[in-house]
């Protein structure tokens, strides 16, 4: 009977200690839950997210540097064409003077070494009007290797792609400006003006102190 009382007393003591510890444990759990719910979630800001991107752009070796002057060290791309490769330097218009259009136009490089003639065509004998007022520009004729002629039929041909090609301009100044813009060497051939002396039949009867002529209108 005494042993049963001791067991009951020990069980009651253990129950009291467990009930006393339960509020402290529950209080700590509740406080932790409340603190977690009260603390706002940390969201990364936009500025902090952009900083690595800026650093990556600055540290990237592929970033193109800003240039205020033309890059004269551009290599030639010979794979584009044997005759018309990419020029050694690309000018962006910041240079003084006239920029040759052949640098970036893609025209054959052979045209840059050609000489052009600027002239005013003469009026044919069968024409009496003044329609020949346009100035003409044509290229010089190559001497060797660009022309052949059939001895039997007399047919002629040439490997020069500008033979027989000419351009017309309204004034001589426009032709000169175009030649300078393209980078051509040019020379201007001024037209030969014919001076006519007015003649009249009445001049045969004018007084002349010198020896008389049969025909005075020559």
UniProtKB/Swiss-Prot annotation:
Residue segments, region Disordered: 31-74
* Any one biological process term the GO annotation gives: electron transport chain
Compositionally biased region (Basic and acidic residues): 50-60
Q: Which controlled-vocabulary keywords does the entry list?
A: Electron transport, Membrane, Mitochondrion, Mitochondrion inner membrane, Respiratory chain, Transit peptide, Transport
Major location (coarse): mitochondrion
Q: What GO cellular component is one of the record's annotations?
A: mitochondrial inner membrane
InterPro entries recorded: NADH_UbQ_FeS_4_mit-like (IPR006885), NDUFS4-like_sf (IPR038532)
Query: What family is reported?
Result: Belongs to the complex I NDUFS4 subunit family.
Q: Function of this protein?
A: Accessory subunit of the mitochondrial membrane respiratory chain NADH dehydrogenase (Complex I), that is believed not to be involved in catalysis. Complex I functions in the transfer of electrons from NADH to the respiratory chain. The immediate electron acceptor for the enzyme is believed to be ubiquinone.
What do we know about how this protein assembles, alone or with others?
Complex I is composed of about 40 different subunits. This is a component of the iron-sulfur (IP) fragment of the enzyme.
What name goes with this protein?
NADH-ubiquinone oxidoreductase 21 kDa subunit, mitochondrial
Tell me which species this is from: Neurospora crassa (strain ATCC 24698 / 74-OR23-1A / CBS 708.71 / DSM 1257 / FGSC 987)
Q: What is the phylogenetic placement of the source species in the record?
A: Eukaryota, Fungi, Dikarya, Ascomycota, Pezizomycotina
């Amino acid at each position: 009977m005494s042993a049963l009382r001791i067991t009951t007393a020990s069980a009651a003591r253990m129950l009291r200690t467990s009930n006393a510890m339960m509020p402290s444990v529950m209080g700590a759990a509740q406080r932790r839950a409340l603190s977690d719910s009260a603390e706002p979630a940390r969201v990364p800001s936009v500025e902090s997210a952009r900083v690595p991107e800026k650093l990556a752009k600055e540290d990237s070796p592929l970033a193109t540097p800003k240039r205020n002057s033309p890059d004269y060290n551009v290599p030639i791309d010979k794979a584009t064409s044997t005759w018309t490769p990419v020029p050694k330097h690309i000018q962006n218009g910041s240079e003084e003077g006239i920029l040759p259009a052949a640098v970036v136009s893609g025209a054959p490089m052979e045209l840059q070494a050609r000489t052009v003639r600027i002239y005013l065509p003469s009026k044919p004998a069968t024409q009496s009007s003044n329609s020949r007022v346009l100035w003409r520009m044509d290229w010089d004729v190559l001497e060797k290797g660009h022309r052949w002629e059939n001895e039997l039929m007399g047919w002629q041909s040439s490997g020069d792609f500008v033979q027989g090609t000419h351009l017309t301009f309204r004034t001589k100044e426009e032709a000169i400006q175009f030649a300078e813009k393209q980078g051509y060497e040019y020379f201007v051939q001024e037209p030969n003006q014919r001076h006519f002396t007015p003649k009249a039949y009445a001049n045969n009867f004018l007084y002349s102190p010198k020896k008389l002529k049969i025909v005075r209108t020559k």
